[in-house]
């Protein structure tokens, strides 16, 4: 837990074995996050950061709390779309977002080869909560200030 450290930048020269990581409040870029080896729970509530993309490399992450974080809607959308487009080897995750992603919660348009390509954050949320193979080990849960989206298996 580095919340009380007042860290404005974190530099890691090699992977750091860590199951839980907290950096609440303050302002700090997240470019160190891919070097947190084995992290499955991260609390970044009230953090100010320009991008969430480094978190997309944390494929073992199962809980991410961004409650009241100062993160733009565009940065949240970019992160959610990256989760979908780079999904291979990723665990399901319980995400708490600071803002409602852009767009409409609906299946995205398919490309020429039939793959869904999300254009907005809520289209990415739809895919994360509807793709059966991505929810086999556990359900994706995405909480926004207005609504909670979760995978629900199809009933026979």
Label the model's feature ranges.
Residues 1-9, 16-30, 36-75, 84, ...:
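Concave beta-strand-loop units of leucine-rich repeat
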Residues 75-78, 123:
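Extracytoplasmic/secreted proteins, especially bacterial periplasmic and envelope-associated proteins
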Residues 121-127:
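Residues within well-ordered alpha-helices
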């Amino acid at each position: 837990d580095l919340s009380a450290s007042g860290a404005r930048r974190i530099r890691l020269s090699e992977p750091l074995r860590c199951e839980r990581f907290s950096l609440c409040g303050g302002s700090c870029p997240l470019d160190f996050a891919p070097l947190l080896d084995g992290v499955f729970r991260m609390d970044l509530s009230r953090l100010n950061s320009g991008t969430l993309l480094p978190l997309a490399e944390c494929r073992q992450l199962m809980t991410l709390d961004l409650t009241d974080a100062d993160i733009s809607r565009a940065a949240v959308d970019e992160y959610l779309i990256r989760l979908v487009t780079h999904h291979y080897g990723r665990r399901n995750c319980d995400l708490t977002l600071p803002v409602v992603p852009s767009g409409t919660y609906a299946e995205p348009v398919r490309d020429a080869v039939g793959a869904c390509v999300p254009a907005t954050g809520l289209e990415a949320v739809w895919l994360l909560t509807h793709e059966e193979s991505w929810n086999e080990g556990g359900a994706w849960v995405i909480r926004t200030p207005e609504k909670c989206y979760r995978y629900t298996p199809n009933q026979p």
